[in-house]
């Protein structure tokens, strides 16, 4: 059952995390080897089949440092990096290595920026980056103004025993969410499109509601019998106020 699979994956991650937390950093200064061991088992528990890429991936006459792909998921790209930067000061500040360019690497950008660049340069829509501590699902930004990604704090999830959050992670990140036929978008993309449609409907409904509220309040201000109403009507007659003034004040009041 699904519950049993989630429980097994959770138990496996917690056991692996104990070994990960007790690792010896002397032989792995950037944490790359230990993070890869941890996350390869993590992805396996969610039915990913990671195919390691010994050389950079070429796309559109460019090379990208994408160490893993998932062939069964349309070559879904995955970046796994160490959780240490090699810079003591940065590590002490707890800077996320997904947003930092690690010393000594040939990657010219941070892992997050590398993945985003790859997605925007190819037809791939989604990619995953992780340093063992944090996991991000990134979407290309071809049609978006803001960066779009979902982040899970794996360290806090395990160390603070947030099983409910792990259930959410499993249900969201399982391979079934990214598999698709040639005609249909994957479930993740279907969810994304529905969220945009839902947001548009909400904004349209909100716009109608705001307009109706402004009409009702506007009539009350102009036609009301109070001293303030009379003063406003007089201001309009004197040219001290106009419809734009009323509109601005109504918007300020509503929001």
Question: Locations of the language-model features?
Answer:
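Short, basic/polar, glycine-containing "phosphate-handling" surface segments that engage DNA
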Residues: 1-26, 75-255
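Active-site metal-binding core of divalent-cation-utilizing nuclease and nuclease-like domains
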Residues: 46-75
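Generic structural signal for well-ordered secondary structure
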Residues: 31-32, 36, 61, 111, ...
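Acidic-basic catalytic patches of nuclease active cores, encompassing PD-(D/E)XK
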Residues: 21-55
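Surface-exposed charge patches
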Residues: 37, 41, 68, 117
């Amino acid at each position: 059952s699904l519950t049993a699979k989630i429980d097994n994956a959770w138990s496996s991650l917690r056991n692996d995390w104990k070994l990960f937390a007790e690792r010896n950093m002397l032989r792995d200064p950037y944490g790359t080897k230990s993070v890869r061991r941890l996350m390869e088992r993590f992805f396996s528990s969610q039915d990913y089949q990671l195919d390691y890429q010994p050389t950079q991936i070429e796309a559109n006459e460019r090379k990208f440092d994408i160490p893993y792909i998932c062939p069964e998921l349309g070559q879904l790209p995955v970046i796994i990096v160490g959780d240490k930067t090699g810079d003591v000061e940065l590590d002490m500040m707890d800077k996320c290595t997904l947003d930092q360019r690690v010393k000594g690497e040939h990657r010219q950008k941070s892992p997050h920026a590398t993945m985003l660049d790859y997605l925007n340069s190819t037809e791939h829509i989604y990619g995953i980056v992780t340093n063992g501590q944090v996991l991000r699902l990134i979407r290309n930004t071809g049609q978006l103004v803001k960066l779009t990604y979902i982040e899970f704090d794996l360290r806090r999830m395990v160390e603070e025993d947030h099983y409910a959050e792990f259930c959410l992670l499993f249900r969201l990140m399982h391979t079934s969410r990214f598999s698709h036929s040639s005609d249909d978008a994957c479930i993740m993309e279907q969810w994304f499109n529905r969220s945009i449609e839902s947001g548009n409907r909400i904004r349209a409904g909100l716009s109608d509601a705001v307009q109706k509220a402004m009409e009702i309040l506007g009539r009350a201000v102009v036609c009301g019998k109070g001293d303030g109403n009379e003063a406003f009507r007089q201001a309009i007659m004197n040219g001290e106020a106009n419809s734009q003034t009323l509109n601005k004040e109504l918007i300020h009041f509503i929001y």
